[in-house]
Amino acid sequence: MVSAILTDKKRNLRDAYSSALIELGHKNPDVVVLDADLALSTKTKRFGTVFPDRFFDMGIAEANMMGVAAGLAACGKIVFASTFAVFATGRCYDTIRQSIAYPELNVKIVATHAGISVGGDGASHQMLEDIALMRVLPNMTVIAPADATEMEDVVPAIAEHEGPCYVRIGREDAPIIFETHGAFEVGKGYVLRLSLIHI
């Protein structure tokens, strides 16, 4: 059961993502990171600074990035592909479906700027349909981390999980819900509060 929930402290999930990627990169030389010209916004640029030979900026070519991710995964790499959620799922749906989900390749799509809180980017960058699009794909595991602490646990967990994953994170800082690490498991939920009424 989660006991420490919704403190006043906040952290950004993108910062947690980049920190966890760097830590994972030190432990596993098969981790490769791709980005689609948004590495400063997705925070993957930090990984590229530490591991320049394992970071590839694919430019404004999101569907091509997913195709490259599929190819690298087919060669045994653990691929993290990042861009904004609107581009990761909207522009790349067919490529993800045909080249990643159906062949069950080990690609981890980490999409930032999900939902409606995208700052000055406006309505054209908002993405509400991403969970629906990714959830219906065969073999795809969909994860929406609750906070930065959980995001730091999600990265190594999905690296260990064989098969495609879609991780959805927002742009803004989020309240800290989990004070400690280690509770996250792929496919498992949490009891937030016990009640007399169970729905």
Give names to the regions the model predicted.
Residues M1-A174, A183-K188:
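Thiamine diphosphate
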Residues V191-S195:
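Short beta-strand-to-loop junctions in surface cap/lid or active-site-entrance loops
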Residues I197-I199:
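Conserved small/polar residues in nucleotide/adenosyl-binding loops
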